[in-house]
Amino acid sequence: MKNITVIGGGVLGSQIAFQTSYSGKKCTVYVMDDKCKMELITKLDALKDNYIMAIKDMADKKDWCRGISDYDTFDKDKCLEMVQKGYDNIVIETDLSKAVSEADLVIESITEDFNIKRNFYEKLSKLLPEKTIVVTNSSTMLPSKLCKYTGRENMFLALHFANSIWKNNVVEVMKHSKTDDKYFKMVMEFGKEINMIPLPIEKEKSGYLLNSMLIPFLFSSLDLLVNGISDVESIDKAWKYGTGAPEGPFEILDKVGLVTAYNIVEMYVKIPSFLAPYNFKGISKMLKVYIDKGKTGKSSGEGFYKYCD
């Protein structure tokens, strides 16, 4: 698959686009309007700097980013050239029909809201070429819940990336009962072609592999905060210094984005308090306060922490 369209220019959408273009694919990103386009350009500028910095660190053997290059084939100058070409070749489009007109693969990476996704897929289904495979990067929604809105159930599946994909280069490939094995294998191969490690998921599971482990961890951390057990910094330190992990849960939440976290929590707020394993209602209210103040995470300059340019 050569022509790839990414839908959405958020945290992961921008990363998927950059990695895809870096790997030599023709990549188009669809965003809703010029404001979103400018926000995406800012993200792509930052990603370019991140890749360049990572390559220099790799050359000095300080760190390794498997999404950029294997250890045995690493060539600093070649990788830097690929970064510039990848950056230059990304096309940003605000017309959906133009964005998908030649797509072999469409990767949807929009807000974790079922109604928004459903409405988008209903619109998309009327515009797609017959050849196009469609995947969702949804963190939590099962492809079987969305497939009927795509108009191509057998060509639809999930392709879920981890954050900082140039470094954390795993991608989860999950089919549903109507996914044709031919397209499942094609998406697995695409993962390899953009230097990811594709992890096959043969049976649907909300949260896939990574988030089935990550989301309860983040819920536990938010629960400690909202119930007044401890503060953000102390909870992060407990995890980092206690396990040797590079990031604490609230640093992870700021990278993921508090809007995404809020939308996931909202799926659980109707669980009766006496049955809920966490204080979902309290967590939802707390996150809403941050979001209403514009503190949506690292991309906005502030979430649980403040970030300098």
Where are these regions (language model features)?
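Structural signal for hydrophobic packing residues in well-ordered secondary-structure cores
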Residues: 20, 44-55, 107, 128, ...
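Rossmann-like NAD(P)-binding element
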Residues: 35, 50-133
